[in-house]
A protein has these predicted regions:
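Conserved adenylate-forming
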Residues: 1-3, 11, 90-94, 101-108
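Conserved ATP-binding/catalytic segment of the ANL
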Residues: 2-60
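Adenylate-forming
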Residues: 13, 47-74, 103-121, 140-144
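Acidic-histidine catalytic/liganding microenvironments
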Residues: 31, 78-79, 141
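C-terminal boundary motif of the adenylate-forming
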Residues: 39, 77-102
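Generic structural signal for well-ordered beta-strand positions
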Residues: 43, 49, 66, 157, ...
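Residue-level signal for inorganic ion chemistry
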Residues: 46, 75, 95, 147, ...
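Conserved C-terminal "lid"/linker of ANL adenylate-forming enzymes
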Residues: 83, 91, 129-168
Length: 168
């Protein structure tokens, strides 16, 4: 079993970027291998699973590799979460979470009469509940110290990927 960057080679793999020799040299090795930028893991049966992107990997305080996409996947499975982003801030893992506030208010409206006075408190309770849930599902060094409410949707690329660099 091994872990590292996924490389690909074959007739169906690109030969480089059009009229961009510098960019091509960054991703194509001299012997023709394409460096995908994906982090992969081979299991005991030689099946490849993608852990995340090399440029997104966070190195923890003890040197362990933390894959934010794995944590984001757990967060995004939690009720009322629309999207999330995990970053490292001042040495701590922080999740920024965009939730469906209307669904969340509707959920709590059934339990509490005057929700308008308590909306901020309900969001804080929800985020703490989310943090505990995620920490029960991930390994020790991938534990979140803070979950932050993201009031607006994250800015995205044309391919609908979150522009991570805007949130560091």
């Amino acid at each position: 079993t091994g872990e590292g960057e996924v490389w690909a080679k074959g007739d169906n793999v690109m030969k480089g970027y059009y009229l961009e020799p510098e960019m091509t040299a960054e991703v194509i090795t001299p012997d023709g291998w394409f460096r995908t930028g994906d982090l992969g893991h081979l299991d005991k049966d030689n099946y490849l699973s993608i852990r995340g992107r090399l440029k997104n990997m966070i190195v923890g305080s003890s040197g362990e590799n933390i894959y934010p996409e794995e944590i984001e996947s757990v967060i995004n499975d939690f009720g009322h979460v629309i999207e999330s982003l995990v970053v490292q801030q001042k040495g701590k893992l922080v999740a920024m979470v965009h939730v469906n506030i209307e669904e969340l208010q509707a959920k709590y409206q059934q339990m509490k009469k005057d929700i308008s006075d308590q909306a901020e408190l309900l969001v804080e309770e929800y985020l703490e509940e989310l943090r505990r849930y995620v920490n029960s599902k991930v390994n020790k060094y991938s534990q979140l110290q803070l979950v932050v409410y993201q009031p607006e949707p994250f800015q995205k690329t044309a391919t609908l990927k979150i522009k991570r660099f805007l949130y560091y």
